[in-house]
């Protein structure tokens, strides 16, 4: 991770943001002073860019994590121009429709929030299952089950999203997989 954004702009740290640096960012956020500028003062090899968004930085992977529509069409063009390889939508609807269209048109690996965020929903489901069965799984058991669920989601996206040229349209795959799951459940219940 080389960038972190806030309402005041973003920081770029070519040395990477990990360990003590993440702890410092968490301290900044916990203080109620939700800004990132002090990071550049504490870590002088980093740069603070006021009033801008991190999508102009050359990166291999972009992860919109904060709010809906935080990555727009112009941001997508910057990422594409800078040869981004993969975009993973961590926040719900982190990318605008224009950004998504640009990623798909350029055949980039774009993982939509409905597939990426499924891990959180799945973990909640696993927790409810444990509670209902009055059981307690180890962290490793939960992690193994979560990996299995996420692998299955990926396989469904590949199954339904692979285009004739081999490009995997994860949006299409996730949408069709979601539809198929609901349709099969309705048929199993005799609704359709």
What are these regions (language model features)?
Residues 6, 13-23, 75, 98-100, ...:
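Short acidic, glycine/serine/threonine-rich loops at helix termini
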Residues 78-192:
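Adenosine-phosphate binding glycine-rich loop
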Residues 48-61, 69-85:
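Rossmann-fold NAD(P) dinucleotide-binding segment
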